[in-house]
Regions:
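Alpha-helical scaffold segments
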Residues: 1-146
Length: 146
């Protein structure tokens, strides 16, 4: 099968196609698969362990990501994965609780863009030590200046 066809199936294919593609050697195929909002839990189980950070990065931004996969990705060693998770519109509160204290300012900056943020997280980011994070949270639609 041609690589281009595999990439298309990774995004739009049936479960049977995806079953075959989840362990494909081609990074682009797995990357496209990770962003598929119709991805089944069993496929996410495989992709959350992928050694390639680009695959985990794309999975972290998937709006259909299951809580248990967020549990894993919230502690990912790569900040880019955590940054994309921070932007996920369906991020669970407990993961916001973790990411709001992330040591990396860019993770917190990306969290400040998440329109699903709870008031307590907005308030905490409004007192962040980093100027970039402060400026970003002040542009949040639910931010109320003191």
């Amino acid at each position: 099968m041609k690589e281009q066809h595999k990439q298309f199936l990774a995004r739009y294919g049936s479960k049977e196609h995806i079953d075959k593609l989840v362990k494909d050697k081609n990074l682009d195929v797995r990357y496209n698969l990770a962003g598929n909002p119709s991805l089944h839990k069993e496929h996410m189980d495989e992709l959350v362990k992928d050694k390639n950070l680009d695959v985990r990065y794309n999975l972290a931004g998937n709006p259909s990501l299951h809580k248990e996969h967020m549990d894993t990705l919230v502690d990912d060693e790569d900040r880019n994965v955590r940054k994309n998770l921070a932007r996920n519109p369906n991020l669970h509160k407990e993961h916001m609780d973790t990411l709001v204290d992330d040591e990396d300012k860019w993770v917190r900056w990306n969290l400040a863009m998440n329109t699903s943020l709870h008031k307590e997280h907005i308030d905490k980011l409004a007192n962040d030590k980093d100027e970039l994070v402060l400026n970003k949270i002040k542009n949040h639609p639910n931010y109320k200046s003191p």
